């Protein structure tokens, strides 16, 4: 008599019903594997796993340590930056903090610059001291102060600065800084978010590492959170090891959206460079504008540095209105095309008053201590027609007159 298979929970049948091996595909876009972990072959699993652990077999193990989509994004950014390796993480802030934790030892010392993203400053000034790490803060152009810091603290392991900086778009002399830091074996890390790899090749200029909030220009559509750190293989490996401990993993879909954004990076940045420069020039001539901060203008304190090491000056223009807090707010409220939002680098133009959107909780004294003026406006130029953007900004300046 033929035996009838015993009906159970179907676990064995479920295992046997695994999907077939992937077909060779000629798809134009990357296929995203949504996995938290990766299984190995059903034959010689342990031997293959040992080979993977010893670096003799290329594969993926666990989602926090990497996945094919993220690795593809890392490779593209690596090539764009002319770097040896690249790590993509969950945000630009995650990339910065993971780097600092990985490369600055307990009791160590770091040098940074005055004008920078608020949360980076907060991490350096309030979190690192808990591990005995001290910091010297210098003006972006003050090479003498950097040299003095390196002499007084030869244990300085890292110089870290944005270039251009946020929000005043100061530029540091990367080759000169790299030469000074080489004397003491100090690593140089440059946050090149405002520049992009198209406008500035920080690694070629002497930086050991270059960081990006990939949320901004690299992804470019105001719909992704991601960070990237590229550079020499050794420091990137150290950051990757720390990243694997801390987490901060970007998910495969976000990595895919980042890859999508990279496809149009050249088109977007070329337009934004030209439009921002034109808007900066017109703002400088406008009677209601007291000062314009844009490295493409000869009036900018670091224009000579920017002209030497950048091929374009980026899509962000900061400017000061001849008005008080509420008069400046009236300009921001009167624009029609940009969104009022705290980001930059996307296809849509964005505008903000840093006093209100980023530093309101600091109070007047706190804002003054870090150089944030009530009259300051930061404008991130998108891909809209420059004449439309200017007409809108001009009418906002006129309408808001007291």
Feature locations, PLM:
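Conserved C-terminal alpha-helix-loop-beta "cap" of PLP-dependent enzymes
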Residues: 289-377, 381
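PLP-dependent enzyme catalytic core of the Aspartate aminotransferase-like
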Residues: 84, 125-126, 134, 148-152, ...
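N-terminal glycine-rich, Lys/His-bearing helix-loop that initiates the first secondary-structure elements
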Residues: 1-60, 402
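Conserved PLP-enzyme active-site core in the AAT-like
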Residues: 86-288, 293
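Positively charged, small/polar-rich N-terminal and surface patches that mediate targeting and assembly
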Residues: 22-28, 39-40, 68, 230, ...
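A common structural junction motif
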Residues: 247, 335-345, 396-402
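Conserved N-terminal alpha-helix of the aminotransferase class I/II PLP-enzyme fold
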Residues: 42-94, 119-127
């Amino acid at each position: 008599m033929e035996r009838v298979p015993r009906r159970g929970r179907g676990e064995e049948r479920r295992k046997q019903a695994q999907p077939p091996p992937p077909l060779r595909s000629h798809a134009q876009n990357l296929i995203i594997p949504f996995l938290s972990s990766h299984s190995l072959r059903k034959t010689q699993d342990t031997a293959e796993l040992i080979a993977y652990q010893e670096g003799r077999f290329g594969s993926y193990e666990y989602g926090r340590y990497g996945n094919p989509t993220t690795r593809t994004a890392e490779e593209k950014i690596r090539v764009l930056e002319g770097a040896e390796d690249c790590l993509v993480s969950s945000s630009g802030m995650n990339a910065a903090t993971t780097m600092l934790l990985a490369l600055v030892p307990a009791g160590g010392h770091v040098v940074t610059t005055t004008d920078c993203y608020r949360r980076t400053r907060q991490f350096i000034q309030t979190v690192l001291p808990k591990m005995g790490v001290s910091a010297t803060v210098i003006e972006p152009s003050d090479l003498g102060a950097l040299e003095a810091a390196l002499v007084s603290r030869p244990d300085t392991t890292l110089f870290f600065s944005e270039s251009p900086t946020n929000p005043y778009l100061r530029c540091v002399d990367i080759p000169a800084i790299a030469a000074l830091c080489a004397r003491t074996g100090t690593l140089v890390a440059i946050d090149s978010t405002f520049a992009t790899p198209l406008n500035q090749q920080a690694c070629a200029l002497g930086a050991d590492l270059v960081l990006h909030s990939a949320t901004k220009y690299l992804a470019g559509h105001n719909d992704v959170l991601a960070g990237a750190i590229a550079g020499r293989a050794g420091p990137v490996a150290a950051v990757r090891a720390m990243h694997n401990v801390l987490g901060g993993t970007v998910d495969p879909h976000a990595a895919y959206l980042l890859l999508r954004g990279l496809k149009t990076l050249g088109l977007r940045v070329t337009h934004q460079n030209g439009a921002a420069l034109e808007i900066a020039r017109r703002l400088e001539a406008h009677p209601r504008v007291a000062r314009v901060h844009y490295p493409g203008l000869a009036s900018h304190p670091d224009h000579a540095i920017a002209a030497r090491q950048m091929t374009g000056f980026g899509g962000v223009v900061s400017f000061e209105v001849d008005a008080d807090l509420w008069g400046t707010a009236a300009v921001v409220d009167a624009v029609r095309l940009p969104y009022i939002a705290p980001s930059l680098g996307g296809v849509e133009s964005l505008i903000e008053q840093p006093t209100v959107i980023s530093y309101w909780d600091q109070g007047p004294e706190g804002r003054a201590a870090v150089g944030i003026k009530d009259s300051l406006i930061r404008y991130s130029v998108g891909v809209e027609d420059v004449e439309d953007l200017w007409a809108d900004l001009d009418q906002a300046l006129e309408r808001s007159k007291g």
